[in-house]
A protein has these predicted regions:
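N-terminal secretory signal peptides that target proteins for export/translocation
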Residues: 1-6
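Short hydrophobic/aromatic-rich beta-strand segments that constitute the beta-sheet cores
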Residues: 58-60, 85-90, 104-109, 115-117, ...
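Gly/Pro-enriched, hydrophobic low-complexity segments
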Residues: 91-96, 136, 144-292
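Extended lipid/amphipathic-ligand handling interfaces
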Residues: 45, 75-81, 99, 241-243
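N-terminal leader/targeting segments and the immediate start of mature chains
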Residues: 23-72, 82-84, 155-161, 166-169, ...
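Amphipathic hydrophobic-ligand
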Residues: 69-76, 263
């Protein structure tokens, strides 16, 4: 049987319908991949999860660029948010810090010579050497402040700078992948004010004090500045940040940070336990299994 050719108008309508259907299916599949989540909704959920965080346990793998080379560490962390209490174990080294105790110092078992417990300032040279951060920045509130500052910087351009890239499996768990970009990342001149240090400057600008130290070769330490000095500071915390956000906990479990030189730092969280109450003895030096 010989088929009659389709009328041009019918053919045009058929093609148009197929194109529209194809476009609709593509959009639905893309939306379903992130459960119709927008970047703005995702960030609100992340901030809510952080603000409702009471306790957390996790294993942390950390890579930080120190003097041009990536330095790797692994640690086990127990953290209570309020009042802030922290226990940290790194290859035989133990750190215990509890808010309002020990004159603000951390109790440290060095696990080696001098084989005695030490009381150390978390911001001091012994605890801070070759580290991007101190124990004071552990947890998520520091990261939350940096992200919120990034939102203030981009204003109504959130969809250009904060991009939800879909979902990705991480350590067997489903995560949202979020890209935060500042393509205009640059270095600016900053005049040091009275009583400022690199740490107070970094907190004010929501940038990394280690990055400032690394890029001002004349400075030896974080307090090596005085009023009137002119230093270089970054325009934002990063040029690119890639976050994997656990779909259940709504907390970042992977954080990769890039600056104008490349990879700056990565933090990867494993075996997280969120809001599981602690036995308060776990924040005492005599707790079973500790070696203080």
């Amino acid at each position: 049987m010989k088929l009659k050719p389709l009328h041009p108008l019918i053919l045009l309508l058929t093609v148009s319908f197929l194109m529209l259907t194809s476009s609709f299916i593509t959009k639905v599949e893309s939306s379903e991949e992130t459960g119709n989540m927008t970047n703005d909704e995702l960030l609100r959920n992340v901030f809510s999860a952080i603000d409702n965080l009471k306790t957390i346990r996790y294993n942390l793998q950390c890579n930080e660029r120190i003097k041009g080379r990536m330095q790797h560490t692994e640690s086990k962390v127990k953290l209570q948010v309020v009042p802030r209490k922290l226990y940290l174990y790194i290859k035989g080294i133990e750190v215990l810090w509890c808010e309002g105790t020990n004159n603000g110092n951390a109790l440290v078992n060095p696990g080696s010579f001098p084989y005695i417990n030490l009381n150390l300032d978390p911001n001091g040279s012994l605890m801070r050497k070759d580290q991007h951060h101190t124990i004071n920045e552990m947890g998520y509130h520091y990261l939350e402040d940096i992200i919120k500052d990034g939102l203030r910087k981009v204003g109504d351009k959130i969809d250009k700078n904060f991009i939800l890239l879909g979902e990705e499996k991480y350590n067997g768990r489903v995560c949202y992948k979020l890209s935060i970009t500042f393509p205009d990342f640059t270095w600016n001149s900053y005049t040091v004010k009275k009583d400022e240090t690199l740490i107070t400057i970094a907190r004010k600008l929501h940038v990394s004090e280690y990055m400032i130290l690394e890029n001002n070769s004349k400075l030896d330490w974080y307090n090596d500045v005085k009023e009137g000095d002119v230093i270089k500071v970054p325009s934002s915390y990063s040029k690119l940040t890639l976050l994997l956000i656990d779909k259940e906990y709504m907390l970042p479990v992977s954080n990769k940070v890039f600056d104008d030189k490349g990879l700056f730092e990565t933090y990867e969280y494993y075996d997280m336990q969120v809001n599981k109450p602690f036995d308060q003895k776990e924040f005492t030096k005599g707790f079973e299994g500790y070696n203080f």
